[in-house]
Amino acid sequence: MKKNEDKLPELKELAESRKELSPMIGNLEIISKEEVRKIIPSFDNNGDVLYASGGGRVEGERFVNTLLTASKVNVVREKVSLKVVGDKYEINGQVFDTVVLATGAWLKDILEPLGFDVDVRPQKGQLRDYKVSDENTGSYPVIMPEGELDIIPFEKGVVSVGATHENDMDFDLTVDKQQLDAFGEEAENFLGELKNAQIINERVGIRAYTSDYSPFFGEVPTLE
């Protein structure tokens, strides 16, 4: 969605250019509010929107738990450090040939003792889960207004609203209801059912960000 509808054709053109690498985007078309309401009855917006038939949504916690169960890995729930021992790596007394550093915002803390200055910082994100009366939300598409707000419908009337992008909060995991209330009020302008919805959960997490917002991946120099 765009505040200025005149920019929708440009957005559609950009999305079309990315379909070759991301065919999951599906078909793209600019549709009216009335057409959206055939898909989402309580949708409320005055202008046209760009609709993508593909894409998907993931409930992060369930996804992570599924991966952990399938991999059968031994999850260590404590702070660890990484040491280089010859051509191998030691973590909490265990030695490995190769280590994948999927540590998110904690990557800087892991590599700093080894002499690396890593351009990764923590960014706080909060979202709130609502329960609406419509039980058919599982077939609704994600609503993405311009800005930080996303409205993500799941099955059986559960709708997630978020997520905040809070800098300079370090690793603070406290819930800020004022921030979530503001997001909820904004979301009501796009999904009317949220006005009478029940709050069922609030979640806080830390995402990793770089100074130029680009993805950060690859082998660590000198540790290949």
Residue ranges and their predicted role:
Residues 27-70, 164-169, 224:
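Helix-loop-beta segment of a Rossmann-like dinucleotide-binding subdomain
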Residues 7-8, 58, 82, 106-109, ...:
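Glycine-rich nucleotide phosphate-binding loop and flanking beta-alpha elements
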Residues 92-98:
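Core beta-strand elements of the Rossmann-like FAD/NAD(P) dinucleotide-binding domain
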Residues 56, 75-90:
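A conserved short coil-to-beta-strand element within the FAD-binding core of flavoproteins
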Residues 32-33, 75-79, 201-203:
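Short loop/edge segments at beta-strand edges and connector loops
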